[in-house]
A protein has these predicted regions:
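Conserved short strand/loop->alpha-helix "switch" segment adjacent to the catalytic nucleotide/phosphoryl-transfer site
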Residues: 35-57, 114-116
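Short helix-loop "hinge" at the ATP-lid/N-box region of the Bergerat-fold HATPase_c
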Residues: 63-68
């Protein structure tokens, strides 16, 4: 895993993170710590940070589990940019073309035994984001998700 931070200047918090992961499910666990560090530097609320972790866990688990037809090592690039109260989250992979926007939402009104298997993770991602865009460029999938970013409340100092 490789991690890159970029800030807006000496007086500003880091506003961007870029993480390169291998196509191995154990990499998701490593991602959580880096997102925690990013969230602290950007003063993200615990709710926003939890939802960011959940979104990326769902997306990355799907990419790692289903995108590759071989057992070779592949890189998955995750970017998160914070600006104007919004997180822009991008996941880029070189797996098989897959547009998650073409998957219909699950029918949650049907009894559990009658529902199709799968689709709940993507449904969760849709619920936690304000928009999702997909494109296929240069033999890579690009998934861009936007989410409102709440800041953590400043801690009160007792004197």
């Amino acid at each position: 895993m490789a991690i890159f931070f970029r800030g807006g200047g000496a007086s500003m918090s880091y506003q961007q993170i870029r993480i390169v992961l291998k196509n191995d499910l154990s990499e998701i666990t490593k991602l959580h710590g880096e997102l925690e560090n990013f969230g602290q530097k950007c003063s993200l609320s615990s709710k926003t940070l939890f939802e960011l972790n959940l979104i990326l866990e769902e997306v990355l688990a799907n990419v790692i589990s289903y995108a590759y037809r071989d057992n070779r090592r592949h890189e998955i690039v995750v970017r998160a940019d914070l600006g104007d109260g919004e997180l822009v989250i991008e996941v880029e992979d070189d797996g098989r073309p897959f547009n998650p926007l073409q998957i219909p939402p699950p029918d949650l009104d049907r009894p559990l035994r009658e529902r199709n298997v799968g689709g709940l993770g993507l449904h969760l991602v849709r619920e936690l984001t304000s928009s999702i865009e997909y494109s296929r460029r240069e033999e890579k999938n690009h998934l861009v998700m936007r989410k409102k970013a709440e800041k953590s409340e400043p801690r009160q100092r007792w004197t």
